[in-house]
């Protein structure tokens, strides 16, 4: 029976899952929209929602807690300075998941996870190695 099994394993070890979701949180905060598989998006959503709630509460201890969860200080700064102000009046529901068809190759269900009221200019901003080489 599946009683009490809340999260998906996603065929990964616990350390791999934790690192993957930390990276996905940082990417979502950076670009405000990412494309991933539907099960990963569904698992990522509550993690990001809790991080935004930490950002709204503010404070040094909560900032350190967010850093330990995400490992990317620049995105934690954006979380506490930009996103916390944007969602100050919203009581949860900071993200949405939109189904995006199926991936060619393995037919995996894909989804777009994005912030509600997101900044359209953040998408693809400072993305990948090409940007670093050009700078």
UniProtKB/Swiss-Prot annotation:
PROSITE patterns tied to this protein: RIBOSOMAL_L17
Keyword DNA-binding: no
GO cellular component: cytosolic large ribosomal subunit
Keywords: Ribonucleoprotein, Ribosomal protein
Keyword S-adenosyl-L-methionine included in the entry's annotation: no
Source species, domain of life: Bacteria
Molecular functions (GO terms): structural constituent of ribosome
Matches recorded under Pfam families: Ribosomal_L17
Listed InterPro entries: Ribosomal_bL17, Ribosomal_bL17_CS, Ribosomal_bL17_sf
GO BP of this protein: translation
Family classification: Belongs to the bacterial ribosomal protein bL17 family.
Subunit structure: Part of the 50S ribosomal subunit. Contacts protein L32.
Cited HAMAP family: Ribosomal_bL17 (MF_01368)
Protein name as annotated: Large ribosomal subunit protein bL17
Protein's organism: Rhodopseudomonas palustris (strain BisB18)
């Amino acid at each position: 029976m599946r009683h009490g099994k809340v999260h998906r394993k996603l065929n990964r070890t616990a350390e791999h899952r934790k690192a993957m979701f930390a990276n996905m949180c940082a990417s979502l905060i950076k670009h405000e929209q990412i494309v991933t598989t539907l099960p990963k998006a569904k698992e990522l959503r509550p993690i990001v929602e809790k991080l935004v709630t930490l950002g709204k509460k503010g404070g040094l201890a909560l900032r350190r807690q967010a850093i330990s969860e995400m490992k990317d200080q620049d995105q934690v700064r954006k979380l506490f300075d930009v996103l916390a102000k944007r969602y100050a009046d919203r009581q949860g529901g900071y993200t949405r998941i939109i189904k995006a068809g199926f991936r060619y190759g393995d037919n995996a269900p894909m989804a777009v996870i994005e912030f509600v009221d997101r900044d359209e200019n953040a998408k693809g901003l400072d993305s990948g190695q090409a940007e670093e080489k050009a700078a």
